[in-house]
Amino acid sequence: MAEVRPPGLFRRAWRWLFSPSPRWSVFALLAIGLLIGAFGVIGTGVAVAVTGTSEFCGTTCHSHQQFVYPEHQQSVHYNNRTGVRASCTDCHVPHHYPAKLIYKAKAGMRDAWAELRGTIATREKFEHERWRLANNVWDEMRENNSENCRSCHNPTAMSSAKQSEDAVKQHKKFAAGKATCIDCHTGVAHKEPEEPKEPAKAEAPK
């Protein structure tokens, strides 16, 4: 009686490809994985789109609806002669992936926790925190060389004939890498905060 030889490597791989387990083939598992991945990509895209509107940012939190969003609606970034409107995410959220998703997740959790704690729940609390909050944003912008500003404003496309002498001088510094947008343009989308007179941190209102 001839000896039965075990199947070769190629045959074993072929069998495993179609039946890695008694219940599922590799192709079935791949199809399920692709389906889950597709739902994940579509779901993420929908979530980013829904949470990326100014209406969502400005009205979801009570404090934003009461204090932050109305200021933005009165700014030149909301109403202007050209009709070009900058949304909250245009200025505050990175425009590229995966940085956009990471920032939105971190900022969402941070803002939700602050809202639950009532950090800026009243006008008095908001004004007390305004300087600190503004500087946090300005520091972020300086770190990335005002990347979000430059996604709309291109210094090489600016007409020096339509700018003041000082603006032309400052924009030359910017083009040379010696300055960044936020060094000069603070208070363009929200009220300019007043620097605290006392260097020591004042007690937060209760």
Question: Where would I find each of the regions flagged by the language model?
Answer:
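Short sequence/structural segments immediately N-terminal
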Residues: A2-K206
